[in-house]
Amino acid sequence: MNILVTGAKGQLGSEIQVESDAYKEYNFFFEDSKSLDITQSEIIKNYITEHNISVVINCAAYTAVDKAESEIEKAEAVNVLGVKNILSALVKVKNSKLIHISTDYVFNGTNHIPYKETDDVDPIGIYGKTKRVGEELILNSMIDGIIIRTSWVYSSFGNNFVKTMMRLGEERENLNVIFDQIGSPTYAKDLANLCLFLLDKDFQNRSKIYHYSNEGVLSWYDFAKCIMELANIDCEINPIETKDYPTPAKRPNYSLLNKSRIKEDFDIEIPYWKDSLKECIKIIQN
């Protein structure tokens, strides 16, 4: 089976590349935006045909949440048109499958209990809106595809909250971090292993949307404090409210995801957030 992983140089794509070594029965093709432009329909169609691709793990996304507010066309090109082009190419492939990564930003963040896959979506920013349109394209397609919504992704690869906090913690005596946004982080390595685990699963007659993040509930403030503690960095973390840290794009105040469906449907256990964070920090520091 030939599998295409888009967004291969991002956090998740990089983790899949490392973890895929354990899956020798598959042929993996890893491409980033420079080597494969998913916004060009003919390019993606030709690639999938020439390489006999039957499964796509779509990690490609425009994820610059604040920039998206002023770069709407760029966000739409990847998050909407890119998805449309992948679907159009896969339609011509027999028994094709798609694993697509989406986001907690499709919700408005006003819930007080973890979001289920069946809850109403109401994105409050351009990034979330474009990701939701991408979801709708998949839901309305004939492709056997599943959408995995995730949140607060970090990794030893790329730029993310964990690495930023570690760097700033070494440079400064104290940092202000938001305490009134609640959710759960996702170690990209755990998500990568989920994507690989799903490769041989039958997507027919299954739910189309699943939620996945690490287990636990915390704020960005809690997360930052734990990063400093586990990394043994002497930096004081001060809690601030969202209103004290204005950004171009609004963030959901509450984005905890209910993961019951994926745990029950695929009989999986999800690692606790602190255990995964500990593992990631160890890799970063080594």
Task: Annotate each language-model stretch with its function.
Residues 70-99:
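NAD(P)-cofactor binding segment of oxidoreductase domains
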Residues 201-246:
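Mid/C-terminal beta-alpha module of Rossmann-like enzyme folds, strongest
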Residues 136-183, 189-190, 196-197:
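NAD(P)-dependent short-chain dehydrogenase/reductase
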Residues 3-21:
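N-terminal Rossmann NAD(P)H-binding glycine-rich loop of SDR-like oxidoreductase domains
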Residues 77-85, 106-148, 153:
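Catalytic helix-loop patch of NAD(P)-dependent Rossmann-fold dehydrogenases
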Residues 41-78:
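NAD(P)H-binding glycine-rich loop region in Rossmannoid oxidoreductase-like domains
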Residues 156, 181-190, 212-230, 279:
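Substrate-binding strand-loop-helix patch
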Residues 219-221, 225, 241-280, 284-285:
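Conserved C-terminal active-site "lid" loop/helix of NAD(P)H-dependent oxidoreductases
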